[in-house]
Regions:
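Short, flexible segments with low predicted structural confidence
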Residues: 47-48, 97-98, 120-121
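Short glycine- and Lys/Arg-enriched binding-loop motifs that mark or flank ligand-binding interfaces
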Residues: 72, 89-93, 125
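N-terminal start-of-chain detector that recognizes signal peptides
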Residues: 38, 58-60, 81-86, 106-109
Protein backbone atom coordinates (compact mmCIF):
# COMPACT_ATOMS: atom_id res chain seq x y z
CA UNK A 1 0.00 0.00 0.00
CA UNK A 2 2.85 2.35 0.81
CA UNK A 3 4.27 2.10 -2.68
CA UNK A 4 1.00 3.45 -4.15
CA UNK A 5 1.37 6.64 -2.13
CA UNK A 6 4.96 7.04 -3.27
CA UNK A 7 3.99 6.36 -6.87
CA UNK A 8 1.28 9.03 -6.71
CA UNK A 9 3.72 11.49 -5.14
CA UNK A 10 6.25 10.78 -7.89
CA UNK A 11 3.60 11.27 -10.60
CA UNK A 12 2.57 14.55 -8.96
CA UNK A 13 6.19 15.73 -8.77
CA UNK A 14 6.78 14.86 -12.44
CA UNK A 15 3.61 16.75 -13.41
CA UNK A 16 4.67 19.84 -11.45
CA UNK A 17 8.23 19.83 -12.82
CA UNK A 18 6.92 19.23 -16.36
CA UNK A 19 4.45 22.10 -16.04
CA UNK A 20 7.14 24.47 -14.79
CA UNK A 21 9.52 23.40 -17.57
CA UNK A 22 6.79 23.79 -20.21
CA UNK A 23 5.84 27.25 -18.94
CA UNK A 24 9.49 28.27 -18.89
CA UNK A 25 9.95 27.06 -22.46
CA UNK A 26 7.23 29.43 -23.68
CA UNK A 27 7.61 32.32 -21.23
CA UNK A 28 11.38 32.73 -21.49
CA UNK A 29 11.52 32.86 -25.29
CA UNK A 30 12.75 29.39 -26.16
CA UNK A 31 9.71 28.82 -28.40
CA UNK A 32 10.36 30.42 -31.80
CA UNK A 33 7.43 32.63 -32.87
CA UNK A 34 8.89 33.47 -36.31
CA UNK A 35 6.35 33.36 -39.12
CA UNK A 36 9.09 32.05 -41.42
CA UNK A 37 8.95 28.64 -39.72
CA UNK A 38 6.00 26.30 -39.37
CA UNK A 39 4.94 25.39 -35.85
CA UNK A 40 5.79 21.94 -34.53
CA UNK A 41 2.97 19.50 -35.31
CA UNK A 42 1.76 19.32 -31.71
CA UNK A 43 1.55 23.13 -31.48
CA UNK A 44 -0.22 23.39 -34.85
CA UNK A 45 -2.70 20.74 -33.72
CA UNK A 46 -3.33 22.47 -30.37
CA UNK A 47 -3.84 25.87 -32.02
CA UNK A 48 -6.19 24.46 -34.68
CA UNK A 49 -8.19 22.55 -32.07
CA UNK A 50 -8.43 25.63 -29.83
CA UNK A 51 -9.47 27.79 -32.78
CA UNK A 52 -12.22 25.41 -33.91
CA UNK A 53 -13.56 24.86 -30.39
CA UNK A 54 -13.70 28.61 -29.76
CA UNK A 55 -15.43 29.36 -33.06
CA UNK A 56 -17.93 26.57 -32.50
CA UNK A 57 -18.75 27.81 -28.99
CA UNK A 58 -19.15 31.48 -29.93
CA UNK A 59 -20.82 31.14 -33.34
CA UNK A 60 -24.53 31.47 -32.59
CA UNK A 61 -25.89 33.67 -35.41
CA UNK A 62 -28.31 32.13 -37.87
CA UNK A 63 -28.66 33.12 -41.53
CA UNK A 64 -31.41 35.68 -42.16
CA UNK A 65 -32.74 33.62 -45.06
CA UNK A 66 -31.69 31.12 -47.67
CA UNK A 67 -27.99 31.22 -48.51
CA UNK A 68 -28.83 29.52 -51.82
CA UNK A 69 -30.44 32.66 -53.27
CA UNK A 70 -28.49 33.42 -56.49
CA UNK A 71 -28.71 37.19 -55.93
CA UNK A 72 -27.22 36.76 -52.45
CA UNK A 73 -24.38 34.59 -53.81
CA UNK A 74 -23.61 37.16 -56.53
CA UNK A 75 -23.65 40.01 -54.00
CA UNK A 76 -21.34 37.93 -51.83
CA UNK A 77 -18.87 37.50 -54.69
CA UNK A 78 -18.76 41.27 -55.14
CA UNK A 79 -18.31 41.87 -51.39
CA UNK A 80 -15.65 39.12 -51.24
CA UNK A 81 -13.67 40.93 -53.95
CA UNK A 82 -14.26 44.46 -52.63
CA UNK A 83 -13.37 43.60 -49.02
CA UNK A 84 -10.08 42.02 -50.09
CA UNK A 85 -10.85 38.41 -49.19
CA UNK A 86 -9.44 37.36 -52.55
CA UNK A 87 -5.99 38.66 -51.56
CA UNK A 88 -5.49 35.94 -48.97
CA UNK A 89 -7.92 33.21 -49.99
CA UNK A 90 -7.93 33.52 -53.77
CA UNK A 91 -11.11 33.04 -55.78
CA UNK A 92 -12.24 31.11 -58.84
CA UNK A 93 -9.64 31.97 -61.47
CA UNK A 94 -7.72 34.27 -59.10
CA UNK A 95 -4.64 33.23 -57.11
CA UNK A 96 -3.66 34.52 -53.69
CA UNK A 97 -1.90 37.86 -53.44
CA UNK A 98 1.88 37.43 -53.36
CA UNK A 99 2.19 39.11 -49.96
CA UNK A 100 -0.08 36.53 -48.31
CA UNK A 101 2.52 33.81 -48.90
CA UNK A 102 4.31 34.88 -45.72
CA UNK A 103 1.31 34.42 -43.44
CA UNK A 104 1.51 31.62 -40.89
CA UNK A 105 -0.62 29.71 -40.64
CA UNK A 106 -1.37 29.80 -44.36
CA UNK A 107 -4.78 31.24 -45.19
CA UNK A 108 -7.12 28.30 -45.77
CA UNK A 109 -8.25 27.30 -49.24
CA UNK A 110 -11.96 27.98 -48.79
CA UNK A 111 -12.94 25.47 -51.48
CA UNK A 112 -11.45 22.74 -49.32
CA UNK A 113 -12.67 23.74 -45.86
CA UNK A 114 -16.18 25.05 -46.54
CA UNK A 115 -17.71 21.56 -46.49
CA UNK A 116 -16.53 21.16 -42.89
CA UNK A 117 -17.91 24.49 -41.66
CA UNK A 118 -21.41 25.61 -40.82
CA UNK A 119 -22.67 28.99 -42.05
CA UNK A 120 -22.80 30.29 -38.46
CA UNK A 121 -19.09 29.47 -38.06
CA UNK A 122 -18.14 31.21 -41.31
CA UNK A 123 -20.18 34.26 -40.30
CA UNK A 124 -18.49 34.44 -36.90
CA UNK A 125 -14.99 34.17 -38.39
CA UNK A 126 -15.64 36.92 -40.95
CA UNK A 127 -17.24 39.19 -38.36
CA UNK A 128 -14.73 38.63 -35.53
CA UNK A 129 -11.54 37.51 -37.25
CA UNK A 130 -9.10 35.03 -35.71
CA UNK A 131 -6.32 36.27 -33.50
CA UNK A 132 -2.70 35.45 -34.40
CA UNK A 133 -3.60 34.16 -37.88
CA UNK A 134 -3.78 37.29 -40.02
CA UNK A 135 -7.57 36.92 -40.41
CA UNK A 136 -8.95 40.40 -39.69
CA UNK A 137 -12.29 41.18 -38.08
CA UNK A 138 -14.95 42.73 -40.28
CA UNK A 139 -17.26 43.64 -37.39
CA UNK A 140 -17.72 47.13 -38.83
CA UNK A 141 -19.37 45.63 -41.92
CA UNK A 142 -23.16 45.27 -41.94
CA UNK A 143 -24.27 41.75 -40.96
CA UNK A 144 -26.32 41.45 -44.18
CA UNK A 145 -23.17 41.94 -46.24
CA UNK A 146 -21.27 39.39 -44.17
CA UNK A 147 -24.07 36.88 -44.80
CA UNK A 148 -23.71 37.47 -48.56
CA UNK A 149 -20.01 36.63 -48.25
CA UNK A 150 -20.95 33.46 -46.35
CA UNK A 151 -23.42 32.58 -49.13
CA UNK A 152 -20.71 33.05 -51.76
CA UNK A 153 -18.10 31.07 -49.80
CA UNK A 154 -20.64 28.26 -49.46
CA UNK A 155 -20.79 28.05 -53.26
CA UNK A 156 -17.17 28.99 -54.06
CA UNK A 157 -16.23 25.48 -55.21
CA UNK A 158 -18.97 25.55 -57.87
CA UNK A 159 -18.42 29.09 -59.18
CA UNK A 160 -16.55 29.34 -62.47
CA UNK A 161 -13.80 31.92 -63.02
CA UNK A 162 -16.04 33.64 -65.59
CA UNK A 163 -18.93 33.88 -63.13
CA UNK A 164 -16.69 35.27 -60.40
CA UNK A 165 -15.24 37.86 -62.76
CA UNK A 166 -18.72 38.98 -63.86
CA UNK A 167 -20.14 39.00 -60.33
CA UNK A 168 -17.24 40.83 -58.71
CA UNK A 169 -17.37 43.91 -60.94
CA UNK A 170 -17.96 46.90 -58.63
CA UNK A 171 -21.38 48.48 -58.87
CA UNK A 172 -21.55 52.14 -59.86
Amino acid sequence: MRWKGRLLALIGLIAIVGSIAGAGYFLFGFYNVAASQAEPDVVAWALARTRMASVDRHATERPPGSLDDPAMVRAGARAYAERGCVNCHGAPGVGWGKWSEGLRPDPPDLKKIVKDREPRQLFWVVKNGIGMTGMPAFGYVDDKEIWTIVAFVGKIATVSPEEFKAWSVPTQ
